Amino acid sequence: MNVTGLYLIVAAIGIVLALIAYLRNRNNIGGIIIGFSLMEIVIMAVIGVINGVLGTPNAMLGRLFMTFSGSYGFLAFAAICGFFYISGPLAAYIIRKPGAATIAETMNGVAQVLSGNPNGVMVLGAGFLQGFMSDMAFAFYGYKNWTLPVVALSGALAPLLQQIPEVYFFGVGDMGLGYNLVALAIRMVSGAVYAVVLVRPIARGLARAGVVRGTAVAAEEGKARLHGQVA
């Protein structure tokens, strides 16, 4: 198997996962398209823009790795890619509606382009793919399971399709099958780790501060606080 074959399989896996998510939610398909409140739209935009603006220096650091680290540069870059994937799981965890991760990550891509990301307009597509696959993790559970393992899965799935265009953009397709598998694995682990470490603490901190009033996570935090007072 060559690298092209590998990424055809990866793309097929992504499509199958999306199909499974659809089938698991097909009986509630009427509720899948849910409108967002103005506050939720603002939250998704702000999360995406902040992560995107901060992601541009991260991308520059990745370029530095690839310039001075030779064949290991892309792998080193993969280890910090989890930062790019945070806006999807974070927005989804706060809002808890289908599409929140996709919208936030797409806004992330827009912000990266406007803030001078050295990788150019490619990051727009990358942002959409990251968010779409992040959404799939929550879709598997009907957008009803918001536990830490599912948050980790959301971060891990983000690069599954996103790495495909980047491999050809950065020209590492010729590095071989094993190299590309390792790069994908590192990105998935990085996505999971960043999600586990950052998503819930940030979301709960924002809820306690009253910044995300009217969202699902704010309601959950309010109930937890009330329960603690009653206890």
Which sequence ranges carry the predicted segments?
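Short helix-perturbing small/polar motifs within transmembrane alpha-helices
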Residues: 17-23, 37, 43-48, 125-167
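Transmembrane helix-loop junctions in multi-pass membrane proteins
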Residues: 54-65, 98, 111-117, 165-169
